[in-house]
Amino acid sequence: NGYYTSFMHPNTSTFWNREEVYKKGYNIDEYNDINSFQNIERAGEFYSDEGFFKEAVYLMNSYENKFCTTLVSVTTHIPFYLDGVSNLDEKLTITEEDLSTFENETFRNYLISCNFVDYAFGEFLEELQNAGLMENSILVVYGDHGAGIEANTDLEKLYSENNLEYTQIEDKIKDVHIPFGIKVPNIKDNINIQRSVSKIDIKPTILDLLGIKDNFSLGKSIFTNKDYSFIKGLGFITSENYCINEKIYNRQTLEEIEE
């Protein structure tokens, strides 16, 4: 449909063999890994989303025609270290008092990294706006998987502080929840989709918004009224139930269904 396609990721090309996958498998027009960027600070084992987003806006602003770009950021990936980020304290709103009730170091680092990425993403949106790239663009944001933290004690504290009851099955259900949002030009009212949706629904949803016929997709546009289950690991999820380890739980009551 005439879109210039590009991929950007501040990591090496050998990780998940991304270069081969995107160039030969997806046949994209432009591939960018860490070697394509010049001014990105280290953030522990990875690179800072703040610098990555700035470089991404610079590259996208250089495209002459309409484009479809995929960005994969890494700062909120475990182990959540931010060593190397300049002036970090000035970019955080989370305080030591906020963190004081959590004993698990990994979970504390997770909260700090999320707080930093929240700042970096805000800067990213502002730079997109200043570059004139937001007016006619669909922006899709999603996470690829859960945090991967084994910190049940801290999660219990987090739930209790927000007057929520914590259970192991609820933790399993929430672990499959990832952030997913779409910003569409000229649509001001928020729409909250309550049905079960998955990453395989992203492509058909975008094509639906663009009015492009979808000849084949495993998923469905989230704007359809059809509900269905999808697989997470060895579990099955619908809007009503969650099945894992040969047991079925009601998602509203979190109680096991015996029959």
Task: Tell me what each language-model feature is.
Residues N1-E259:
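Solvent-exposed soluble domains appended to multi-pass membrane proteins
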